[in-house]
Amino acid sequence: DIHPIVTTHHIGKKYILLTNEETNTDLTQIAVTQLKAGETAEEHLHPTMEEFFLFQKGDAIMTVNKEQIVCSSGDFISIPANTLHSLKAVTDIEIITIGCALR
């Protein structure tokens, strides 16, 4: 069983499916992330990692370099390293998140 943990942004919860310790790749993590309506991952960046989001359910607003993007089920967002981004759940959301370390 995969047990949920609090996200690194101290909101919502995530179920970690795979980490870099479990593979010989540049992958940092694959997780299913769940946020409740109104929860926000404040603006931040990752200097050594690219991040990818596949929205599974719900509606959210992803802000990338000050540009707001409305996201819903089926949407895929790619965030390059060193790119400011934030995420606000408009409704309860579920996202597959993938992090990949830079080479």
Regions found by a protein language model. Give the residues of each.
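Short acidic-glycine-tyrosine-enriched beta hairpin
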Residues: 66-81
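Ligand-binding loop in jelly-roll beta-barrel domains
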Residues: 81-103
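Conserved short histidine dyad/triad with adjacent acidic residue
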Residues: 31-47
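A short, N-terminal "cap"/entry segment at the start of jelly-roll beta-barrel domains
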Residues: 1-27, 42
